[in-house]
Amino acid sequence: MAHKKGTGSTRNGRDSNAKRLGVKAYGGETVTAGSILIRQRGTSVLPGVNVGKGKDDTLFALTDGIVKFESIRRGLRNRKRINITATA
């Protein structure tokens, strides 16, 4: 017989690191070319004028300017699009 109580085992105890997703530059903010605007999984926000899309769906500014969000009708649902209006 055992003199000590055996330790139990568990299948829990794991968690993934936060990925820091979300909007990084809001409407009306001034950004420089290359600035990250939104980190996202999938294209919940579509790239518009002067906005590029990375391979992980990150949206970034192609030129210096001011961030502007707009809502567009795409099929049966409304989508958001982000544009950069260039500053002179």
UniProtKB/Swiss-Prot annotation:
PROSITE patterns documented for this protein: RIBOSOMAL_L27 (PS00831)
InterPro entries assigned: Ribosomal_bL27 (IPR001684), Ribosomal_bL27_CS (IPR018261)
A molecular function GO annotation: structural constituent of ribosome
Keywords: Ribonucleoprotein, Ribosomal protein
Highest taxon of source: Bacteria
GO BP, one annotated term: translation
HAMAP family: Ribosomal_bL27
Protein name in the entry: Large ribosomal subunit protein bL27
Gene: rpmA
